[in-house]
Amino acid sequence: MHTAYIPVPTPVRPPSAERWPLAAVAELFELPFLDLLHRAQQVHRQHFDANTVQLSSLLSIKTGGCPEDCAYCPQSAHYDTGVDADKLMPLDEVVRAARAAQANGAQRFCMGAAWRSPKPHHLEAVAEMIGAVKALGMETCVTLGMLRDGQAEQLKAAGLDYYNHNLDTAPEFYGKIISTRTYQDRLDTLQQVREAGINVCCGGIVGMGESRRDRAGLVAQLANMEPYPESVPINNLVQVEGTPLAGAETLDPFEFIRTIAVARITMPLAKVRLSAGRETMSDSEQALCFMAGANSIFYGDVLLTTGNPQVEADRRLLQRLGMRAEGLPCAAGQA
């Protein structure tokens, strides 16, 4: 005789920093895989249409030459990765790329620049880009590095919807990945963004040699923000020759999916986004990520300087899964 399963209601937002202590997040990671996915899917369905994903597109508007020494990044000037330093992309090229992304179904257009911190004249140019993309009817997001006083307010005035600034990893592992920017620097920029009234896009990277507890530490940091980020990109390390992390041990795909599930459980209202590293995932792995609560993907041919599944492949996958892109009337690629 089967006993009916009655789900336990999950709070919408953690009421305080004590809601998700590290030990509690670590316990989620230790759950049997199927139990974890079941719980994450329940939480997901309480707040979202489980068969809908948001499509976002990411354009590098200024590539290479970054003075930071992030061990994973091919755009760092510290490493010889074959990525040349370019100047800021002209406005008309940005608008052309945004139109193409929109034509392919993207709702959010993200613009990334390889800077430690934007200079005033750079910010003025980016503000113009934000206005032009907003005029197309798309959500806007930028990632420009650390912000100085007043810069977040300038971006808000330009109409910016989201600012991306990742924590990358847990505080305990952070020093093994970067030395030119402190963890507190990142938190300070996020606080400026929040105080300016801009939505926060903040996540991290897994597969950099961190432990499962480090992954729990990253999620705990994100979940205990007040409030937690509206958008949480989870990146799977893309190993680039010439960076210190080239040749690192590849993360077990189930560990990546676990990270997605724990992010969904601890941040039930956030958009949990599959970001870098999707091109190495099988369709089955991506489907499990959707089951675990991912509801946004970066969509298009290029994700900054690394590969990303092509548009048609993404459309076919969503169609095979019976899923649809947010804002579109049917499964992506269907008439």
Swiss-Prot record:
GO terms for molecular function: 2 iron, 2 sulfur cluster binding; 4 iron, 4 sulfur cluster binding; biotin synthase activity; iron ion binding. [2Fe-2S] cluster binds at C110, C141, C201, R273. It comes from the Bacteria. Its EC number is 2.8.1.6. SUPFAM superfamilies: Radical SAM enzymes. The keyword Iron-sulfur applies. Disulfide bonds: none annotated. Keywords: 2Fe-2S, 4Fe-4S, Biotin biosynthesis, Iron, Iron-sulfur, Metal-binding, S-adenosyl-L-methionine, Transferase. One of its GO terms (biological process) is biotin biosynthetic process. Binds 1 [4Fe-4S] cluster. The cluster is coordinated with 3 cysteines and an exchangeable S-adenosyl-L-methionine. Binds 1 [2Fe-2S] cluster. The cluster is coordinated with 3 cysteines and 1 arginine. It is an enzyme of class 2 (transferase). Catalyzes the conversion of dethiobiotin (DTB) to biotin by the insertion of a sulfur atom into dethiobiotin via a radical-based mechanism. Belongs to the radical SAM superfamily. Biotin synthase family. This is Biotin synthase. It comes from Bordetella parapertussis (strain 12822 / ATCC BAA-587 / NCTC 13253). The gene is bioB.
